Amino acid sequence: MPANQRKNTSQSSYLQTPRNIATPLTKNAGKIVTTPKKSSTSDSSETSPTMAQTTTKSNGQLPTPPTNNGAPTVNRKKQKRRAKQAARAAAEQAQGSQMSGGPTSGDVKRQMQELEARFRETGLDEQYDDDEQFDPADENAYYSDEEGDAYSGSYGHDGSSTNGYAIPTTNSSKKQKKKKKSKSSQSDHSNHANHGPNGSSHNHVSLPLPLQSPPSMQRGPGISKEKIWNTSSQEERERIKEFWLSLGEDERKSLVKVEKDAVLKKMKEQQKHSCSCTVCGRKRTAIEEELEVLYDAYYEELEQYANHQGGDGPPPMMPPPRRFGAMSGLQPPNRLPPVFNGQQPSRGRIVEQLGDDEDEEGDEEYSEDDGDEDDFSEEEPEEIPRSHATDFFNFGNSLTVQGGILTVADDLLKNDGKKFIEMMEQLAERRMAREEDAKEQYANANYGHPSNGSMHPHSHGHVHNHPPPPEEDEYDDEEDDEDEYDSQEEDYDEEEMDSMTEEQRMEEGRRMFQIFAARMFEQRVLTAYKEKVAKERQQKLLEELEEESRADSQKKAKRAKDAQKKKEKLLEKKRAMAEEKARKDAEKAAEEASLREIEEKKAEAQRLKREENRKKKEAQKKADEEERVRKESEKQRRLQEQRERQAEQERKQREAKERERKEKEELRRQALEAKEIKEKEAKERKEKHEREKREKEAKVKADKEARELQKREELSAQQAAVQAAQSAAHVSRRANQVPTPKLSHALASPHIPVAIPAVPKAPTPIKLRTNSQQDNYSIPRTPSSKYQSISPNSVTPLPNSPGPIGPPGKTPIQHPLLQHPQATSPIHSALKGPPGIPQSPYAGMQPMPGGFQPGMPMVPPGFGRPHHDPMFGLQQGIGSQFRPLQIPNGGIPPFQPGFNIHHMPQGRGFPMHGPPGFPQHSPNGMGSIGQLFGAPKETPPSQTHSRNQSGSFDGLSSATQAQPIARPTPIGRPSSIVHGTRHSDNFNSGESDETSKHLGSSALLDDTDEPINIGVGARRSSAAPGNPGRQNFLPPPFGMDRSDPASMMSSFNTWGAPPNPFGSSSLPGSNGFGGGWNTSLNMNGSFGMTNYYHSQPRSVAVRLRICGACQNLQNSTQDGWLDIDAIKNEIALSTTVREEPLSERELLDICDTEGNPMNGGGTFEIRSSDGKSQIHFVSDSMSHDFRSAGAPGEIGSPISGGASRNLGPPGRAPIGGF
C-alpha cells in the first residue's frame, strides 16, 4: 500500500489502541520489578513490504509480585529530569562517537525514519483515548507537556483524523478498554510468573516478523556492502550477538559509559538555557542523580544477562530494560499474534507499548519530524536485541514499544536531545510537585504547568519565563499546540494521580529511561559492530587489493618471461633460416650461371637466324614497293587522261550549248524585231487614222464651242447691271478671274504659233472622274495630230476655257461672265481680275484635287493623317500648271527651285510636248518647270485626279504659238505612254505612233519579255510604286546620298498626287529632284512620302540582283565563270545598311531556284574550283534588260543599250549609272 496511506492507518490505529501501562517497581541491586496494569489488544489490517503492523494482545504473561521491597521511592519528576539529562549526554556521546568513526548522520536519520515507520505501523494508536490521554482511573497521569503536538501533523485536537479515520470520543469505550486490559493482564500474570531473576514476570509482546526481504538483501555476509549493515537477517543478528559476547568487561563498560557521559554532557548543554531559580536547580540535580542511578543499574543488568547467556534456564535477572513484562507489552517470539504468525521479525525496530506521557512525547517528535527523515537510505545499521532471554542480542525483534520511547533516543541523536531532556525534567518536576502536593493535600486542583519550560509557577510564588534554546527554533510550531493540549492533559493528570501510586509512577519513569538507555546502548553496540566489520572489510579489501597487485605483478613477470623466450626462439629461427637461405642462394647461383651460358648460346644462334630472315624480308619489301609505285603511276596516268577527256567533252558540250543558246537568242531577237516592225506599222496606221478622225471632230467641235461662247458672252452682257449691284461680291470674284495680259516677246512660246479661233463655251458643272472612268481606255490616248487643239472623243465638255484666242499682239475683249455657282471652274482662272488688283501667280492654275487651290500648301499622299490637314504645308511649284520646260542639250532648267517668276504673264503657255526623244508632260497637265529632274511621265491614269484640267494636244509647229493658251481638249493618255503598249483590247485602233518623234520609244525595250507586260504599266518606271527607274545623272537634291537609291525621293510622287515643287525630269530615266516614285523605305526621306514596303519577297529581289551582277561581270572573264566573292561584292554595292547582308549560303541557295520572268529568268551553273565556288549565269533569252553594255538598242530605242544594266530590287531605283 502507499506509504502515506500506511502512515495514516497506523496513526489512526495508534490513537484507538489502549495502552499497556507498565509500572516500574523499586529498582535495587540491579533488579527491576514491574507490575502489570492492563493488557492491550490492537488489530491491524495492513502490512508493509519491509515491515508489518503488529497486533498486540495480552499473552497471559503476568509479572510476579514485587519482591524488592527495599527499593526506595523515587520522585517521578526528578527521575524524568535525570532521564532527560542522561539522554542528552548519551546524544552528545553518540555524536562524538559518530564523528570519531561511528555511523554517519545519514545513517542515523535513516534509522530514525525506519523506527518511526515501524512505530506507526504497530497499531499502538488504539491504546490511546479519544483525546490521546490515559484513563485516570487506571494509570498514572504523567504527561509530557509536548504531548499536544504529538499528532499535530496528522490529527487535529478535536480528535478527528485528517485522513478520514474517525476517533472514538465516548467515555464508555474507554471504560470497556480498561476492563479488557485488566482481565488480560491478570491472565498473563498467571502464565509468566517465573520470568525475571527476582520472580518478577514480564509480559513480552514482540514485534511481528516482517515480510521476507528481497533476494538481494538475503545474501550471505560479506557478499556486498549492504550486508555489512543488514540487521534483518538471522546471520547478521548472530554476528552482533557474537560480537557483544566477544567483548571484554572493560569494552562493555566503556560502551555504557560512553552512553552515560554523552547524555550527561548533552543535558548540561541544554541546562544552560534554563533559569537559575531554586526550583530549576533542584530539578537539574534530580535529573543528574536519576540518570546516574539508571545507567548504573542498566549496566549491572547487562552484565548479569551476559553472564547467564550460556544457561538454558531463565536469565538470573530481568531482561534488558526494554523487556518489562506486561507493562512493556512484551511477547516472546514463540507467542506471536495469530494474525502475523510465520512472518519474519522486523528489522530491529523497538517500539514499546507505554502509556506514559514520555512515550507520547516521543511519538510526537516523530510525527513532527517525519518530513525530515525522507532522505534516510535503506542501509539501516541498527539491530536491536530480541526481548526473550535466550535471544537478547537479536536486538528486540520481539520487542514492541508503542509509547514512542525509542523515538526519544532518535530525537537525542537528531535534535540534541531536547525532547529527552524535557522528558527528564518533567519526571523531576512532577516528583517534586507531588511531594509538595502531598503536603498541601491537593490544594490546587488545577496544578500543572507547561512542561516545556516556557512558563511555570512554583510553590515559592514566583513566575519566570524560560526562553527556548536558540537552536530549537524548529519546534516553535509545536509549542503552540502543546499549550492547547495541556488543558486536556491537566484534567487527566488529576485523575491518574488518584489511580496510580507514587511507587508505580517512579517505576514507570525508570522503565521508560531503561528502555531509552537500551535503545542508545543498542545503537552503540551496532556502531561498534559496524566499525569492527568495516575495519575487517577494509583489511580484507586491502589484502585483496594487495593480492591482486601481487597477482598482476606475477602475471606481468610471467608475461615478460614468456615474451623473452619467444624472442629468443624467433632469433634462433631467423638465424637458421638465414643460414638455409644462404646455402640455397649459393646453389641457385651456380645453377643460374650454367643456365645463362646455355641461354647465351641459344640466343646467338637465334640472332643469326633472325638477321638472315630480316634481309630476305627487306628484299621482298623493296620489290613490292617498286611494283606498287609502278602501278600507282599507271593509275594516275589513266586518271589524268580520263579527266582530260572528260574536260574536253564538257568543253564541247558547253560550246554546243552556247552555240545553241546564241542561235536561239538570235532567232528570238529577229522574231521580236519583225514583230515590233509589224506592230509599229500597224500603230502608225491606226494613229494616222485616229488623227484624221480627231481633226475632223475637233473642227466641228471648235465651231460649235465658238458659237456657244458667243452666246454666253451676250447673255453675260445683259446681266452686267445685276452684277454691278453686288460690287463687293464682284471684287472677290474678279480676283479669281485670270486676265490675259500681253506677253513680252522675250517669253515667246517655243511652239509655232497657230491662230485658232476661240469659241465661247457655256460653263458646265465640273464632274469628277471616277475609278471606272480612269480605267476606261476607249478614249483617245494621243491627239490625232500635233496641231489638234481639242479632243473629238470628249466624254464631258470641259468647262474651263483658256481665254480668248486671237492673233498675236491683240488682246481679246473681256466680257463679263455670268456668275456660275462653281467657283472653282477653270474658266475663271483664265480670266483677268479687276484693274488695280495684283494678279496671283496661281490665278491661271486649275484647282487641285480634293479642293486645294494652286500654290497653297497641300499634304502629299501618305503624309500625316489621311483626309486631314497636313502638319506643315509644301508650296506648290510655280510652273506646275504649265508644260515641262524644254531644256536643250540636257542643261539646267532656266527656272531653278525658288525662283520668283511672279512677273510671268498668266496666259503664257508652254508646249505640251517636249522635243523628239524626250518624255512628254504628265497627262494631268501639271508638269512643272523642274520636270527635268523628275521621272518619265509614263504613268497610268491617276487614281486621285479628275478630268478637270485640260491641255492642248497639238504637236510642234514651226509657227509661233499665240500667247493665249490653246482651247481645252479632253484629257488623254500622254503620247509617251501610248507608244509601245500592247493592250490592244482596251485601246482604239486609231492610236497614233510617236516613235519617229522620240527616236524610238523606250517602252519597246520591254516588248521582248512578254510575261512581264501583263497588266497596265507593269514595266513603267513611274507608273506604280516598286518598279525600278533610271538613276539620275544630276547631283542629288537636298544633300541626299546618291549611293543609296532609297534616299532619292521626292516630297510628292507623280502618281495620284500633284507634282513636287521642282517638277519631274524631262530626261529619260532620270529621277530628278524628287521626280518619279519614292524609293525610300523610311518615312522621313521627304515630306509627304507614303509608307513603302517591298512589293516582292527577298528571294526574288536577291535573284534579280544576282542576275544583274552576273550580267555586269560576264565580260570580266573569258569563259563566263564568276567567283562567288566577286558576285557578292557587286551585290554589296547595291545593298544599303538597312538590308541584311547576303551570305554565301543564301546566294548559293537562291542560285538553285528555277528562273521565271518575275525573278530574272535564266539558270545558274555552280562549280567548285580550288575550294571556291564559281557561278555561270545562262540567260533564257537575250532580253534588252540583260543586254551587254554597249550593245545596240532596240529599233526606236531612245538610248543606247535600251536599259540600265544595273538592276535593283523591285521598288528600288536602279543601281549604278544611267
Swiss-Prot record:
Keyword Metal-binding set for record: no
Entry GO terms, CC: cytoplasm
First and last residue of the signal peptide: none
Cysteines engaged in disulfide bonds, as pairs: none
Compositionally biased tracts (Low complexity): 34-50, 86-95, 206-216, 716-730
Coiled coil: 421-714
Keyword Cytoplasm: yes
Positions with biased composition (Basic and acidic residues): 107-123, 224-237, 431-440, 544-715
Biased composition (Basic residues): 75-85, 174-183
Locations listed in the record: Cytoplasm
Keywords from the UniProt entry: Coiled coil, Cytoplasm, Stress response
Pfam family, one: NST1
Superkingdom: Eukaryota
Biased composition (Pro residues): 313-322, 799-810
Biased composition regions of type Polar residues, renumbered to the chain: 1-26, 51-72, 159-171, 769-796, 940-963
Region described as Disordered: spans on this chain: 1-237, 306-391, 431-508, 544-745, 765-810, 911-1010, 1018-1037, 1190-1218
Compositional bias of kind Acidic residues: 124-149, 354-382, 470-501
Function description: May act as a negative regulator of salt tolerance.
Family membership noted in the UniProt record: Belongs to the NST1 family.
Name assigned to this protein: Stress response protein nst1
Organism name: Botryotinia fuckeliana (strain B05.10)
